[in-house]
């Protein structure tokens, strides 16, 4: 992936994507990972994410998914099918608008939950994140920084830290997710 960030670093423009090894990649989970309780489907084609999900045997797995605008625009039907199978969607505000057509973040969060995942986080970069869940909304600030050089990978780091904290807590209740979100923001 290559792209450029706009002046405020909150929005980006994708300039080029080279799939390279992912063009013919077929992920195979090792037997020891098939019963994982915490699963993060990283940003790859939704068909590959579904292929990973198909290999899981743990019925109580807490499954989070990440994506980018490329998959929303080029593989939207596959991504919408995948959303019916996951517990936790974490995307940024421009991706949420692209997926739902809603520019209002509150309406977008509700619309995303209707697509399947019970829990949704919409990231707003330097402006924090919004966590949507049944009968609730939780807004949290971003970790304050005075100088931002390059936000590439910040969302991946955030979600990885959130899922790592949930796995360490071995819980997925709302309070634990809120705690993990604060942790992810600080990382």
Which residues make up each language-model segment?
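Short gly/ser/thr-rich secondary-structure transition/capping motifs
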Residues: 19-24, 67-73
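Acidic, amphipathic alpha-helical patches
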Residues: 29, 79, 148
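Conserved phosphate/ATP/ADP-binding segment of small-molecule kinases
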Residues: 54-62, 69-141
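Amphipathic coiled-coil/heptad-repeat helices and related helical stalk/stem segments
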Residues: 25, 48-49, 75, 105
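Conserved N-terminal subdomain of the carbohydrate kinase-like
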Residues: 1-40, 54-60
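Short beta->alpha connector loops
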Residues: 43-48, 68-72
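Conserved phosphate-binding/catalytic region of the ribokinase-like
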Residues: 105-187
